Amino acid sequence: MKVLVVNAGSSSIKYQVVDMTDESVLAVGLVDRVGIPGTTLDHSPLGKDKVTIKKDLPDHTAGMELVLQVLVNEEYGCIKSMDEIGAVGHRVVHGGEGFAESVVIDDEVKRVIKECFEIAPLHNPPNMMGIEACQRLMPNVKHVAVFDTAFHQTMGPANFMYALPYDVYEKFRVRRYGFHGTSHFYVAHRAAEMLGKPYEECKIITLHLGNGASMAAIKDGKVIDTSMGFTPLEGLVMGTRSGDIDPAIVFFLMDKLGMNSSEANNYFNKKSGMLGLSGVSNDLRDILEAAGSGNERAKIALDVYYNKVKGYIGNYIAKLNGVDCLVFTAGVGENAIDIRENVCANLDYLGIKMDVEKNKVRGKEVDVATADSKVRIFLIPTNEELVIARDTFNLAK
């Protein structure tokens, strides 16, 4: 079976075609600027040159129509007909409390996804547009939803509840949900394989460090805690998100800067984090370069970043009662040598010792701990699309 993996954003559609006989990727692509003048489709078929098509597309249905045309194109397609696609897997950011695993999409599933529009307004609506576009164009195959929140649904109330009046949980389901679950799931399972232990017997801390960043503590095959919360704003310092702050700062700055709630939401999600602290960029590569040139704000931003990650490592080791491995993944985690080194510095007392020479790699699956480190330190490139393809295949076959 061949599976089409779709990740629909507000103005983009990312896709892959995966042949499940050997899990090979037959094509990857991106439709960018959907509904905006200047739409482009970049399509990279296996063993062929990348193709770029420029064509304005009014909506996600038009975008998916173009994707399907490209997939069967005689010159640069990867399949002969759409009959070869046995199922479609959709990334959905928020499944609320309703889903602890991936599911075949039906009317009830779509109702729950729509219920979560209010708590995931930037992600769930375009995810749903992608689902409905694909269902219109491919009505005879199974469509599967794979939720970013699902992996974290094993958390207990001690870690998912906030100390707010209990009725806000009962009425509005205000609680910690966590995100990046598909990535945490993939690298945690790979880490167990690298440890040579059953996954259900491991204590693992996963660090998904990208422009958005989150960590998870996994024990006996279950997430017990994760750093993102009710929304992806909570937790680590990120590219443009503040992460953990005193909630009173929100009200103070709304008053001082004359912001309404929407403007405040934008302020803490889009103007804060490493961008706000450094004044340089949201990109850690730029901030590292600026710090190396003597920029004091960039240095402070990096110190705040390292401090926050270290704090979560200590927190999670306490909750796990020890740890077998740390796992670095995502754009920063896989590629930023200096970031990894500084995060792991001075953690010897916890049994975490990095080999700085082994650490000088990017994008490879490797153990960078010293031989005598009690805790292994793994770099594992994430593969969310493969998880989506596998779940889709298993539910559709």
From Swiss-Prot:
InterPro entries from the UniProt entry: Ac/propionate_kinase (IPR004372), Aliphatic_acid_kin_short-chain (IPR000890), Aliphatic_acid_kinase_CS (IPR023865), ATPase_NBD (IPR043129)
EC annotation from Swiss-Prot or TrEMBL: 2.7.2.1
Quaternary assembly: Homodimer.
Binding site residues for ATP: 14, 208-212, 283-285, 331-335
Site entry (Transition state stabilizer), positions: 180, 241
Catalytic activity: acetate + ATP = acetyl phosphate + ADP
The UniProt record lists the keyword Cell membrane: no
Name of the featured protein: Acetate kinase
GO terms under cellular component: cytoplasm
CDD domains xref list: ASKHA_NBD_AcK_PK
Active site: 148 (proton donor/acceptor)
Gene: ackA
Lineage: Bacteria, Bacillati, Bacillota, Clostridia, Eubacteriales
Major localisation: cytoplasm
Job description of the protein: Catalyzes the formation of acetyl phosphate from acetate and ATP. Can also catalyze the reverse reaction.
A GO BP annotation: acetate metabolic process
Pathway the protein acts in: Metabolic intermediate biosynthesis; acetyl-CoA biosynthesis; acetyl-CoA from acetate: step 1/2
Presence of the UniProt keyword Kinase in the record: yes
Cofactors, names only: Mg(2+); Mn(2+)
Amino-acid positions noted as binding Mg(2+) in the UniProt annotation, renumbered to this chain: 7, 384
Compartment(s): Cytoplasm
Family: Belongs to the acetokinase family.
This protein's UniProt keywords: ATP-binding, Cytoplasm, Kinase, Magnesium, Metal-binding, Nucleotide-binding, Transferase
Binding site residues for substrate: 91
Bound cofactor: record note: Mg(2+). Can also accept Mn(2+).
Signal peptide stretch: none
Gene Ontology MF terms in the entry: acetate kinase activity; ATP binding; magnesium ion binding
